[in-house]
Amino acid sequence: GRARELYIAAAQRGSAKAQYVVGTMYRFAQYGATRDIAEAVKWYLKAADQGMPTAQFALGRMLMEGKGVVRDDAAAMQWLSLAHVNGSKRAEDYIKTLLKRMDPAEVRAIRDRMTENAKSAG
């Protein structure tokens, strides 16, 4: 419907909030959209890359659970850590769950890589 068209137009113009809404729309088949996980991930990535913690959290959770996407604990840890740093309170519990099931060396490697990325971006 009309709301879907407006959100998609705003998302295409680069609004992170609209990109997150469009991602959610496809993830849960809202506003008359057909459920499309690949499309949801595409829009979540656009919003997450702009630093939106809710999109980073959504991506991390999807990757952690492997629902509609290949489960990837390393990528999930990266997105959830970014979401946490950017203010997502909910990310912490999911990070704790990942820490329990991941190899400590893998977690250290991810944290080192994220620190390097932050230094090169800063």
Predicted regions and their residues:
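Short helix-capping/linker turns of helical repeat alpha-solenoids
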Residues: Y7, Q12-A16, F28-Q30, D49-M52, ...
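TPR/TPR-like alpha-solenoid signature
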Residues: Y20, F57, M77-Q78, D93
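Structural signature of tandem alpha-helical TPR/SEL1-like repeats
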Residues: G1-L6, A33-W43, V70-Q78, A109
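Hydrophobic face of amphipathic alpha-helices that form TPR/SEL1-like repeat modules
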Residues: L6, V21-A29, A33, A58-E65, ...
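Terminal, low-structured helical/coil segments at or just beyond the last alpha-helical repeat
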Residues: N86-G122
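Alpha-helical, heptad-rich or low-complexity scaffold/stalk segments
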Residues: R61, A75, L82, T97-L99, ...
